[in-house]
């Protein structure tokens, strides 16, 4: 059985918790076990939690869940640039997929709400990559 971990940002909690529920339901639909869920303050805080999950031999891959909504400055771009880069680095370092389920940057709250299903897409991406890596 495939076992995944999830890292969820609490910032924009109303959106990320809906994303988490969709992701968990979809993982169950796919027959995938969600082994651990770690909650972090915001998307910028994810890399350390991702690393902790990747170090666990019982976890095949990690799904990230967050919503980076545009504010009055370019802070949202800095967050996404750094988090996405570090997520890729960790995936390559541990040879396990880390799926980007963080919506943004540059989106409004309304757009973030419309993109809640992005969490399901991240689960699907993670599972596909796990299967690919296990088959070769």
From Swiss-Prot:
GO biological process: one example: riboflavin biosynthetic process
EC number, UniProt record: 2.5.1.78
Active site (catalytic residues): 75
Annotated 5-amino-6-(D-ribitylamino)uracil binding sites: 11, 43-45, 67-69, 100
Reactions the enzyme catalyzes: (2S)-2-hydroxy-3-oxobutyl phosphate + 5-amino-6-(D-ribitylamino)uracil = 6,7-dimethyl-8-(1-D-ribityl)lumazine + phosphate + 2 H2O + H(+)
Gene Ontology annotations for the cellular component aspect, listed alphabetically: riboflavin synthase complex
Binding site for (2S)-2-hydroxy-3-oxobutyl phosphate: 72-73, 115
Lineage: superkingdom: Archaea
UniProt keywords, alphabetically: Riboflavin biosynthesis, Transferase
Pathway: Cofactor biosynthesis; riboflavin biosynthesis; riboflavin from 2-hydroxy-3-oxobutyl phosphate and 5-amino-6-(D-ribitylamino)uracil: step 1/2
CDD domains cross-referenced by the UniProt entry: Lumazine_synthase_archaeal (cd09211)
EC main group: transferase
InterPro entries from the UniProt entry: LS, LS/RS, LS/RS_sf
Single annotated GO MF: 6,7-dimethyl-8-ribityllumazine synthase activity
Alphabetical list of SUPFAM superfamilies matching this protein: Lumazine synthase (SSF52121)
Function: Catalyzes the formation of 6,7-dimethyl-8-ribityllumazine by condensation of 5-amino-6-(D-ribitylamino)uracil with 3,4-dihydroxy-2-butanone 4-phosphate. This is the penultimate step in the biosynthesis of riboflavin.
Family to which this protein belongs: Belongs to the DMRL synthase family.
NCBIfam families in UniProt: lumazine-synth
Name of the protein: 6,7-dimethyl-8-ribityllumazine synthase
Gene it is expressed from: ribH
């Amino acid at each position: 059985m495939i076992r995944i971990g999830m890292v969820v940002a609490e910032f924009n909690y109303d959106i990320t918790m809906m994303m988490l529920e969709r992701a968990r339901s979809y993982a169950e639909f796919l027959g995938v076990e969600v082994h651990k869920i770690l909650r972090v303050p915001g998307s910028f805080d994810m890399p350390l939690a991702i690393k902790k999950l990747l170090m666990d031999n019982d976890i095949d891959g990690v799904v990230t869940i967050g919503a980076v909504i545009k504010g009055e400055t370019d802070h949202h771009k800095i967050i996404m640039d750094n988090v996405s880069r570090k997520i890729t680095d960790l995936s390559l370092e541990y040879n396990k997929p880390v799926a980007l389920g963080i919506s943004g940057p540059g989106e409004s709250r309304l757009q973030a709400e419309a993109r809640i299903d992005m969490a399901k897409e991240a689960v699907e991406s993670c599972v596909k990559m796990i299967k690919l890596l296990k088959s070769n």
